[in-house]
């Protein structure tokens, strides 16, 4: 079973939604974690957006990348274009992708929904590719 790490700047919105989708859609196929270059909180609007599609991410936590070891993961996905800021060991794993999705923080609910849809589609494609 492949181990996947989703990373974004604050581990608040995009990476949290990706973790929620991956845990739900990839249950039994992949192991999933998320982190940020810095930690903050799981954004309340991200929680609400995922509730709209029947996924509860309210129990997820926002954790800094320093809490994890890159060698524990086969797949590393940056969601925010922050790949250039990751320590080198994170971008040299078996699979590294930088999805460069828009940050919905502070934007309309429609932007959140659009980003949520983009995250879901990419997570589905990732699961199909690695499982």
Curated annotation (Swiss-Prot):
How does it associate, per the subunit comment? Homodimer.
Organism (species): Synechocystis sp. (strain ATCC 27184 / PCC 6803 / Kazusa)
By its UniProt entry, which InterPro entries does this protein fall under?
Arsenate_reductase_gluta (IPR014062), Ptyr_pPase (IPR023485), Ptyr_pPase_sf (IPR036196)
Q: Which cysteines are joined by disulfide bonds?
A: 8-80, 80-82
The extra comment attached to this record reads: Cys-8 probably provides the initial functional group for covalent attachment of the electron-accepting substrate, arsenate, to ArsC.
| Active-site residue list | 8, 80
Q: Which Pfam families match?
A: LMWPc
Recorded hits in CDD domains, A to Z, give: LMWP_ArsC
Function of the protein: Reduces arsenate [As(V)] to arsenite [As(III)] using glutathione and glutaredoxin as sources of reducing equivalents. GrxA is the most effective electron donor in vivo compared to other glutaredoxins. Constitutes the major arsenate reductase compared to ArsI1 and ArsI2. Also shows weak phosphatase activity toward p-nitrophenyl phosphate.
Mutation effect (residue 8 to S): Abolishes arsenate reductase activity
What Enzyme Commission number(s) apply to this enzyme?
1.20.4.1, 3.1.3.48
Q: Which terms does the UniProt entry file under GO BP?
A: response to arsenic-containing substance
Q: Give the family from UniProt.
A: Belongs to the low molecular weight phosphotyrosine protein phosphatase family.
What is the official name of this protein in its record?
A: Glutaredoxin arsenate reductase
**UniProt keyword list:** Arsenical resistance, Disulfide bond, Hydrolase, Oxidoreductase, Redox-active center
**Catalytic activity, reaction form:** O-phospho-L-tyrosyl-[protein] + H2O = L-tyrosyl-[protein] + phosphate; [glutaredoxin]-dithiol + arsenate + glutathione + H(+) = glutathionyl-S-S-[glutaredoxin] + arsenite + H2O
Q: Does the keyword RNA-binding apply?
A: no
